[in-house]
């Protein structure tokens, strides 16, 4: 459900800001844009695998998350990358038309919240006491790796360097 909200926000932004959508790259060199695109594709595929693993194998009444946390931790981590992601594109288009330091701080905060949440989910899946014999567990972990690279490295660290140039 949350992933659909992100897709709808992106579609709305791209369809209503046609003249600005090419500027979303900022000054990211064309030589690395293909890496972004490839990583985005792997991230989207990975999202389905790690989400499927959680839905199928992690009981909602689970206390297997480090022996003390329940499923609320998973919900918070998902919310940490879904909810801010919904706001990123509209905030970025606003930054293009009416830039302010506060808006830039907001965009950077959104990107770091998403990045840290995805890395937190990867850590949770690796170190928690879940059923790990399923191929879906390993597919989920493998899928989370490009997701973390995309959100924490490419989006939160690399893109901001080039966006405001």
Annotate each language-model stretch with its function.
Residues 2-18, 153-155:
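Alpha-helical transmembrane segments of multi-pass membrane proteins
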Residues 45-61:
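Transmembrane alpha-helical segments in integral membrane proteins
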Residues 59-118:
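Membrane-proximal helix-loop-helix units in multi-pass membrane proteins
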Residues 1-3, 51, 112, 120-127:
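First transmembrane helix
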Residues 116-165:
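Terminal transmembrane helical module of multi-pass membrane proteins
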Residues 29-48:
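Interfacial helix-start motif at the membrane-water boundary
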Residues 15-33, 92-105, 157-165:
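Membrane-interface interhelical loops and short amphipathic "cap" helices
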């Amino acid at each position: 459900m949350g992933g659909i909200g992100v897709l709808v926000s992106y579609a709305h932004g791209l369809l209503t800001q046609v003249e600005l959508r090419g500027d979303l790259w900022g000054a990211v060199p064309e030589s690395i844009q293909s890496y972004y695109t490839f990583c985005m594709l792997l991230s989207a595929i990975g999202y389905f695998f790690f989400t499927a693993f959680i839905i199928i194998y992690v009981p909602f009444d689970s206390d297997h998350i480090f022996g003390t946390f329940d499923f609320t931790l998973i919900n918070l981590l998902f919310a940490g990358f879904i909810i801010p992601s919904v706001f990123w594109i509209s905030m970025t288009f606003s930054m293009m038309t009416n830039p302010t330091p506060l808006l830039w701080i907001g965009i950077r905060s959104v990107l770091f919240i998403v990045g840290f949440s995805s890395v937190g989910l990867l850590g949770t899946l690796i170190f928690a006491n879940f059923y790990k014999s399923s191929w879906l567990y390993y597919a989920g972990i493998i899928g989370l790796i490009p997701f973390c690279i995309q959100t924490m490295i490419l989006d939160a660290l690399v893109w901001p360097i080039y966006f405001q140039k």
